Amino acid sequence: MDTITVEKRNEQLKAKQLRRKGIVPCCIFGGSLPNSISIQLDEKSAEKLLRKLRLGSKIQLKLEDQTIITQIKDSRRCFADNKIEYIDFQALNPKTKVNSVAHVILENTDYVTGVLDKLLMEIPYASLPEDMIDTVTVDLEGKPVGTIITVGDIPEFLSDHIDLQVETDSIVLRIAEKRNAAAQDTEQAAE
């Protein structure tokens, strides 16, 4: 699990002023915290964090003398310049189940001969913090046209420690035949 150092937010400055100085306003809430904590993170660290991790990823925040285990709950970017506006972290209680999402990463997409339809690339689930899944990898090498992969086909989601918030027969992806090839086959059959 990654660890990142954060500092308490300067309450005298508004969020807009912080962003101009290259600082991203953040917030930690939930878990065993009595109140939410306003924190700040420099922009370079925030960019690096969101490049490496995703929403739902577990991360340790080092704030002064304490370490808080959290997950990235939300973030927003400015539409105009694509800079991070804020990041929200949810503190995790080790004994309480938490809602999160697992991201599906596809490998060997170059080997797919048909059209790859990605239908459900974020799988919502609930689990204890120790059982959280950040990403699952699906290898597409050797998968023929007509292949359908459901949530139940991914072994990580069959664990008793995970409560899926979608049906196991929900389609994650399918490999369809290319439309041009189907049209040509129909024309050849007609001749």
Q: PLM features: residue spans?
A:
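Acidic, negatively charged sequence tracts
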Residues: 1-191
